UniProtKB/Swiss-Prot annotation:
Family statement: Belongs to the histone-like Alba family.
Domain of life: Eukaryota
Compartmental location: Nucleus, Nucleolus
Main localization, broad class: nucleus
Gene3D superfamilies in the cross-refs: Alba-like domain
Reaction catalysis annotation: Endonucleolytic cleavage of RNA, removing 5'-extranucleotides from tRNA precursor
Job of this protein: Component of ribonuclease P, a protein complex that generates mature tRNA molecules by cleaving their 5'-ends. Also a component of RNase MRP, which cleaves pre-rRNA sequences.
Organism (species): Schizosaccharomyces pombe (strain 972 / ATCC 24843)
InterPro entries, alphabetized: Alba-like_dom_sf (IPR036882), Pop7/Rpp20 (IPR014612)
Cellular-component GO terms for this entry: nucleolar ribonuclease P complex; nucleolus; nucleus; ribonuclease MRP complex
Gene Ontology biological-process annotations: endonucleolytic cleavage in ITS1 to separate SSU-rRNA from 5.8S rRNA and LSU-rRNA from tricistronic rRNA transcript (SSU-rRNA, 5.8S rRNA, LSU-rRNA); intronic box C/D snoRNA processing; tRNA 5'-leader removal; tRNA processing
Official protein name in the record: Ribonucleases P/MRP protein subunit POP7
Record's keyword terms, sorted: Hydrolase, Nucleus, rRNA processing, tRNA processing
Subunit note: Component of nuclear RNase P and RNase MRP complexes.
């Protein structure tokens, strides 16, 4: 019996994950209170959502926030582990990180 892979997700779980369908203006408004309390927010994006994260950084920069961008290499994990996913051990990918601070 073989099980199909449902979704490939990064094992890196720090910060807020930006997807291609994330509404950027709503995200900025929603995170404004957290940014005022904590002083900084960490966002992350992979693959097709990376241009979306760059656009988010431009919006924050225009509003006068300090931004820093970095990359990290992460391992992608399958939600359902089967024999095939055990054989494909090395599935590495890049994550773009955006830190916004006052």
């Amino acid at each position: 019996m073989s099980v199909e892979r449902i979704k490939r997700a990064p094992a890196f779980r720090k910060g807020i994950i930006i997807r291609r369908k994330t509404h950027l203006i709503a995200m900025i408004r929603r995170m404004r209170k957290k940014l005022d309390i904590d002083g900084s927010i960490l966002y992350q994006a992979t693959g097709m959502a990376i241009p979306h994260l760059v656009e988010l950084s431009d919006k924050y920069k225009r509003q006068g926030y300090n931004i820093s961008m970095d990359t990290a290499t992460v391992e992608f994990m399958d939600e359902i582990v089967d024999e095939v996913s055990i054989q494909n051990k090395n599935r590495l990918g890049n994550v773009l990180l955006l830190r916004v601070s006052r």
